[in-house]
Design a protein with these regions (language model features):
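Catalytic-core regions of core metabolic enzymes
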Residues: 1-151
Length: 151
């Protein structure tokens, strides 16, 4: 199996998922949890929210730095577009290189958004990060019972 195949395997079969920007206010994280329960996912979620010790009944970390070391397979990003590059750098510094970017405000908004998207893509490429997104709904792996889907 090639290095890329191994990385994709870990990306699509993640069992320890950080959700940066998880909040009970907007309902997105609640959707993620509901979809994971529906598919019977064997997934542990680690919501990251600087203002909460718990999000939707799941114990939260107040920062990316507070995530358990060497455990996280994958990170989903639910923050505003202007925070994304900083979040990516923090994740990379923790060795988290598999990323799903839910955030919008990129190519779908026009030329300025395409430039912002290019900056995110360039950063991820340069840092060896696998990126799905931006502005996507996520994925479900029915075979492995993994759900990282907002819909």
């Amino acid at each position: 199996m090639s290095d890329l195949q191994k990385r994709l395997q870990r990306f699509f079969n993640a069992h320890h998922i950080a959700v940066v920007g998880a909040s009970a206010k907007n309902g997105w994280f609640a959707n993620v949890l509901a979809n994971a329960a529906w598919i019977g996912a064997d997934t542990r979620f680690y919501p990251v929210n600087p203002g909460a010790d718990e999000v939707c009944g799941v114990g939260a970390c107040r920062s990316i730095a507070a995530l358990p070391e060497g455990v996280i397979d994958f990170a989903a990003i639910l923050v505003k577009e202007e925070q994304v590059l900083d979040v990516l750098a923090q994740l990379r510094s923790r060795g988290i290189v598999n990323v799903l970017l839910f955030s919008s405000g990129y190519g779908e908004t026009g030329a300025a958004g395409r430039e912002k998207q290019r900056a995110v893509e360039d950063y991820c490429r340069r840092e060896g990060m696998l990126l799905m997104g931006p502005n996507c709904l996520g994925y479900m792996n029915f075979h492995a019972r993994i759900s990282m889907f907002l819909g």
